[in-house]
Amino acid sequence: MKLLSKFFISSALAIFAIAVVANDDWLRSMPEFELTDHLGEIHTMESYSDYDLAVFYVQGVGCPIARIALPNYREVRDEYSGKNIAFTMFNSNIQDNLPRIAKEADEFGIDFPIIKDEGQQLAKALGVERTAEVFVVDTETLDVLYRGPINDQLGYETQRNNASEWYLKDALNTILAGGIVNMDDVPDSKGCLVAIF
């Protein structure tokens, strides 16, 4: 009986360890970087040191989902404007240079800095797969505390009139309260594929 109990305990611990490793692999750390945005400003993680958290949105020129999700991202920024959180974007697409990004920002009224991820260093370090995904970063530890969609309004070839789940807001509320986001409750992000080279 004791051997059986030990077996079940060992199995449970092994499963837990695998889950922790998988979660750690999904929630990676933001690397140190020095990159330029579409306005010519240079960004490093030190640029965000006065903030408690920094939220990064994966932008892509011409991506309809990334464009449609923009008002939702803006809504979250405005709602949390007094919470000492920075909101920005980065673009990892090889084909999107700074002039193209600047043109997109002008045409669609994007009022966030859009960092050009030269060499795809952010995308490779974070495991970026699609646009319109957001990453919440602890500016002190550089740990990614959340990654996923803003909400459930957008899907492939579908769009709800209103979102019923605001995953980013829920994550920020949990983090600000000192909790840990349960990534098992977060669906995969919908967006345009980011080709990694």
Question: PLM features: residue spans?
Answer:
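Sec-dependent signal peptide recognition
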Residues: 2-10
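Bacterial N-terminal signal peptides
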Residues: 10-17
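N-terminal "domain-start" segment that seeds a small globular fold
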Residues: 21-46, 58
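Structural micro-motif
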Residues: 31, 109-113, 128-135
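Short active-site neighborhood of thiol/selenol oxidoreductases, capturing the structured segment around
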Residues: 46-67, 172
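Short, thiol/selenol-centered motifs that function as redox-active sites or metal-ligating centers
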Residues: 60-70, 190-195
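Structural microenvironment flanking redox-active thiols in thiol-disulfide oxidoreductases
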Residues: 67-108, 115-125
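Thiol/selenol-based redox catalytic cores and closely related redox-interacting motifs
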Residues: 119-197
